[in-house]
From Swiss-Prot:
Catalysis: reaction(s): 8-oxo-dGTP + H2O = 8-oxo-dGDP + phosphate + H(+); 8-oxo-GTP + H2O = 8-oxo-GDP + phosphate + H(+)
The name this protein goes by in its record: 8-oxo-(d)GTP phosphatase
Matching PANTHER family: 8-OXO-(D)GTP PHOSPHATASE, NUDIX HYDROLASE 23
SMART domains recorded: PGAM (SM00855)
Chain sites annotated for binding substrate: R43, P44, R45, Y46, D48, K53, G54, K55, Y89, K99, E118, Y136
Residues that, per the record, bind Mg(2+) 2: E69, E73, E118
Record-linked CDD domains: HP_PGM_like, NUDIX_Ap6A_hydrolase
InterPro entries given in the database record: His_Pase_superF_clade-1, His_PPase_superfam, Nudix_hydrolase, NUDIX_hydrolase-like_dom_sf, NUDIX_hydrolase_CS, NUDIX_hydrolase_dom
GO molecular function: 8-oxo-7,8-dihydroguanosine triphosphate pyrophosphatase activity; metal ion binding
Species of the source: Mycobacterium tuberculosis (strain ATCC 25618 / H37Rv)
Keywords for the protein's UniProt record, in alphabetical order: DNA damage, DNA repair, DNA replication, Hydrolase, Magnesium, Metal-binding
Effects seen without this gene: 15.5-fold spontaneous mutation frequency increase by rifampicin resistance screening.
Entry binding sites for Mg(2+) 1: K53, E73, E118
Length: 317
């Protein structure tokens, strides 16, 4: 299910409150009973044990909100991985409506818990013990989904470049057509969203608009954008096998690569990859500025999640 980002709105059935959370995990310790441990938090207001989550703030996308809430509730920084489930349940306060919570797997990259008024305890438990500790059926369902695949997956981020006006209205070499005002805003908004997944390296098809989409992220990471001639629409159409091979070469590198390319490349690339590895991808409209979050285990694709954009205030599934 693709996540489409939009401002929260009132509906006839009541308001939808958008939230985001995670199964926060870390490698198991030497005396742990499992390969990974799960963070379970206690909220004194409700006297319950749950997974970390919270409302998505205006101006945030769900992934950015998830990482912020993890830090606020647990004290841990985290990199998101595969999306798990979207949970919806009714809420009565301060208005009647529903809360919609998007959950991800999230690996702790360090931090230290400090008790507070909202969360006063955090415990790390193996998956079976965490399952027994959680008070809510929806949290246990999320954890079950997490346990379906190995925790430690590799993430690959495939981005369609931002908006760049109309080809018909650009008089120069189309390969040099730049981002327009909205496209530049998309490029800036992509930075926190891609960092939420632990982006480390940046690749862009040999088009000005692809490079410009990645420039803010590359500046934030202090890395060079790798130019990729085989991933332009023309080159990929002439030799898709060469383009796919180049993507697989990129994936072999250590880290979380971000690959920015064009609209006629991405659908074929995602379809080929999913068919090769037996994965059902999200449905998507392949909009400019959108992102595919691909999760791999032992070199094989296990999930293909889509995020519709990075600009809007909240999310709609």
């Amino acid at each position: 299910m693709s996540i489409q980002n939009s401002s929260a709105r009132r509906r006839s059935a009541g308001r939808i409150v958008y939230a985001a959370g995670a199964v926060l995990w870390r490698p198991g310790s030497a005396d742990s009973e499992g390969p990974v441990e799960i963070a379970v938090i206690h909220r004194p207001r409700y006297d319950d044990w749950s997974l970390p989550k919270g409302k998505v703030d205006p101006g945030e996308t769900a992934p950015v909100g998830a990482v912020r809430e993890i830090l606020e509730e647990t004290g841990h920084r985290a990199n998101l991985g595969r999306r798990l489930l979207t949970v919806t349940y009714p809420t009565d306060s301060p208005f009647r409506g529903v809360k919609k919570v998007h959950y991800w797997a999230a690996r702790s990259t360090g931090g230290e818990f400090t008790p507070g008024s909202e969360v006063d305890e955090l415990i790390w438990l193996p998956v079976p013990d965490a399952m027994n500790k959680l008070d809510y059926a929806q949290d246990r369902k999320v954890l079950c989904r997490f346990a379906k695949h190995p925790a430690d997956t590799q993430t690959v981020l495939v981005v369609r470049h931002g908006t760049a006006g109309s080809k018909a209205h650009f008089s120069g070499d189309d390969s040099k057509r730049p981002l327009d005002k909205r496209g530049r805003a998309q490029a800036e908004a992509l930075v926190p969203q891609l960092l939420a997944f632990g982006a480390t390296d940046v690749y862009a098809a040999d088009r000005v608009r692809c490079h410009q989409t990645m420039e803010p992220l590359a500046a934030e990471l202090n890395v060079t954008i790798h130019n990729e001639p085989t991933l332009t629409e023309e080159s990929y159409a002439n030799n898709p096998k060469r383009g796919r091979h180049r993507v697989l070469q990129i994936v072999e590198q250590v880290g979380t690569p971000v690959i920015c390319t064009q609209g006629k490349v991405i659908p074929d690339l995602i379809t080929w990859w999913c068919e090769r590895d037996g994965v059902h991808p999200d449905k998507s409209r392949n909009r400019k500025g959108s992102t595919w979050v691909l999760s791999l285990s032992a070199g094989r694709l296990v999930t293909a999640d889509h995020i519709g954009g990075a600009l809007a205030a909240n999310v709609r599934a």
